[in-house]
Amino acid sequence: MPLIALTGGIASGKSTIARRLAELGAVVVDADQIVRDVQAPGSAVLARIEDVFGADVIDADGALDRAALGAKVFGDPEQLARLNAIVHPAVRAESQRRFEEAASAGPETVVVYDVPLLVEARVDDPWDLIVVAHAPADERRRRLVELRGMAEQAAQELSL
């Protein structure tokens, strides 16, 4: 089973590449979706996040309030490390389960791991190929504004 890591920064084109590879028959495992899945309401990961960061990171529906959590961890390397210590092991285990599930389809199955932060998440895996999506910073900012609805000022402030 060929295992391909697809990585790159925000709005670099990862999702477009992943969609095209899926159209060609690859099984795409989406790290961002796995993060959302392991942090779903009622999950052990979400309960641990609440224990560590407080009830104010949970919204009225019992889901993670990403903005509230972000306010606590971004800009504070120690807090971000605490969050990563909770989330990364669960993401690693679930992604491994999905890789194994894809492999059961046969040895020819190509598996693509769409992961924004490969170096932080799964750098030690035996990748057959690492693909880095790249686009110039001005193009990435344009995509963020036009395709994702980000405020132009916020896009300009990003370090890309």
Task: Identify the role of each PLM range.
Residues 13, 32, 83, 112, ...:
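Residue-level signal for inorganic ion chemistry
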Residues 46, 50, 137-145, 152, ...:
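An amphipathic alpha-helix signature
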Residues 24, 53, 126-127:
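Short, structured coil segments at secondary-structure junctions
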Residues 1-26, 30-33:
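Walker A (P-loop) phosphate-binding motif
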Residues 33-36, 135-138, 158-160:
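Short, acidic/turn-prone active-site loops that include or flank metal/cofactor-
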Residues 12, 44, 78, 90, ...:
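Short alpha-helical
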Residues 92, 96-104, 110-146:
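ATP-dependent NMP and nucleoside kinases share a basic, alpha-helical "lid"
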Residues 33-110:
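ATP-dependent small-molecule kinase phosphotransfer cores
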